[in-house]
């Protein structure tokens, strides 16, 4: 498959209004007070919103669901990454966490922009606590990670983020297995970019995990 690289312009500005939700959720993860969650997603309905695709559109419901769910998936990854600023000990883990934060923020903006351009509901970053998907951490796992420090945090972060990234890759795989999905140009490029970037980061995290001192 030939991939066409899309640019990532100043659509990040579109995302600014929602950015503030992420640090506050990260703080709750540290304190363990993430609140109740309704982990649900139904075919044709995402976050309680019905998905209506116009006749003749170059995308299908699965594309919309993928974008909406991946926004939530990315948002939790950012919560995890920001915990490393205060909890991590390994400079390489901190470097990676910042890379994840800095790359997934604009990717959320790209997904929100895609949804708005197609007149679909674009959730904000707080949406991650409304759903549960492949690889996402539970409330208890986030609470444990938020309480950990130093090498213990690094290990939990790497194990958790490997699981999280693998879940994102599985979501892309499921997208392409859905009839007619993943064919719209921008959605196709974005989904493939997710696989490329997160596969590479999984390799980095596995190496870092192997370098940590034994328990």
Protein language model regions, located:
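C-terminal segment of classical bacterial N-terminal signal peptides
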Residues: 17-28
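Bacterial N-terminal signal peptides that target proteins for export
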Residues: 2-13, 22
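Intrinsically disordered, low-complexity regions enriched in small/polar residues
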Residues: 6, 17, 41-44
């Amino acid at each position: 498959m030939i991939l066409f690289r899309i640019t990532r312009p100043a659509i990040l500005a579109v995302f600014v209004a929602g950015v503030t939700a992420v640090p506050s959720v990260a703080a709750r993860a540290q304190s363990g007070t993430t609140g109740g969650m309704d982990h649900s997603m139904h075919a044709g309905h995402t976050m309680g919103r019905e998905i209506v695709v116009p006749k003749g559109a170059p995308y299908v419901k699965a594309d919309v669901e993928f974008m909406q769910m991946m926004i939530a998936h990315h948002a939790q990854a950012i919560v995890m990454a920001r915990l490393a600023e205060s909890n991590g000990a390994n400079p390489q883990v901190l470097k990676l966490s910042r890379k994840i934060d800095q790359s997934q923020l604009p990717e959320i903006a790209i997904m929100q922009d895609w949804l708005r351009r197609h007149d679909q509901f674009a959730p904000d970053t707080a949406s991650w606590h409304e759903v549960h998907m492949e690889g996402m951490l539970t409330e208890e796992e986030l609470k444990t990670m938020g309480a950990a420090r130093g090498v213990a945090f690094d290990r939990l972060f790497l194990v958790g983020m490997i699981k999280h990234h693998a879940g994102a890759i599985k979501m892309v795989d499921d997208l392409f297995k859905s009839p007619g999905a993943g064919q719209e140009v921008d959605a196709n490029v974005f989904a493939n970019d997710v696989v490329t970037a997160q596969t590479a980061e999984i390799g980095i995290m596995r190496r870092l995990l192997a370098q940590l001192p034994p328990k």
